[in-house]
Design a protein with these regions (language model features):
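Sec-dependent signal peptide recognition
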Residues: 2-9
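Secreted/periplasmic proteins
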Residues: 6, 17-106
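Elongated periplasmic alpha-helical coiled-coil
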Residues: 10-14
């Protein structure tokens, strides 16, 4: 196998299984210290996210305007996007009172 083929194969294996752009929203502070769908307790300023179908415990890389953060899925949401904890949104510079387009890969 030539070096070029080897590098191509290596790049394909290193690529994330799924990558897409979605709308991110931020959890309301009302949920702080309440049970989440995956068996934990939601911490508003912690690093976590909710998604409608990505399995609980999956670590998702979220990217926004050049910033990137690995966030565990700890809850479910009734949306076609991702809900970020305030702590995750703050680190990614997602507006705490709005929505933003983000990239996710897992």
């Amino acid at each position: 196998m030539g070096m070029r083929r080897f590098l191509l194969l290596l790049a394909m294996l290193a690529a994330p299984a799924q990558a897409r752009t979605v709308t991110a929203t931020v959890y309301d502070g009302w949920y702080h210290n309440r049970a989440d769908a995956c068996g934990g307790t939601y911490q508003h300023w912690g690093i976590s996210a909710a998604h409608p179908w990505i399995p609980c415990g999956t670590r998702v890389r979220v990217t926004h305007q050049g910033r990137s953060l690995v966030v565990p899925i700890t809850d479910r949401c009734d949306c076609n996007s991702i809900d970020l904890s305030a702590g995750a949104a703050y680190r990614l510079r997602v507006p705490l009172d709005g929505v933003a387009k983000v990239g996710i890969s897992y």
